[in-house]
Regions:
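Short, positionally conserved secondary-structure boundary motifs
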Residues: 1-59, 90-91, 98, 102, ...
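Short, hydrophobic/aromatic-rich segments at coil-to-beta transitions
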Residues: 48, 78-83
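Short coil-to-beta-strand transition motifs
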Residues: 65, 87-92, 123-124
Length: 139
């Protein structure tokens, strides 16, 4: 999985307000302000990285191939978080769960099996996924 470190990127784009997902609202047809995406989605720039997704193990969480994950390495993973982990030397993205006193990496796709985290497993929680950037499409 390619890791893209975050530099001192600053990109400000026009922010046009809200958009109705139900009935259209012509009252919002004006420019409100400028929105800096890096300030909106990145809370800790020095510990935030982008990773490109491969595979379908997290499609139930809305994470698809070629999506970009925004990952904050300064956050401590909590049960329920989607995390990037290093498992046996390989990057993987899964949901971090606790069930019955045990911790698992749980895929969000029934075609994949949850991974029980135990002392003999080479595992490191690498960071917490804070945002997912993807195109609006269906698989």
């Amino acid at each position: 999985m390619p890791v893209i470190p975050l530099g001192r990127l600053t990109l400000e784009l026009p922010f046009c307000g809200t958009v109705a997902a139900g009935f259209p609202s012509p009252a919002d047809d004006y420019l409100e302000e400028r929105l800096s995406l890096d300030k909106y989605i990145i809370k800790n720039p020095s510990s935030t990285f982008f990773l490109k997704v491969e595979g379908l193990s997290m499609k139930g969480a809305g994470i698809y191939p070629d999506d970009i994950l925004v990952v904050d390495r300064s956050l401590e993973p909590q049960p329920g978080d989607v995390i990037v982990a290093v498992l046996e030397g390989e990057f993987t993205v899964k949901r971090f769960v606790k069930e019955g006193g045990h911790y698992y990496l749980k895929p969000e796709n029934t075609e994949y099996t949850p991974i029980l985290l135990h002392a003999d497993l080479d595992f490191m929680a690498w960071g917490v996924v804070t945002h997912v950037i993807h195109k609006p499409y269906e698989l």
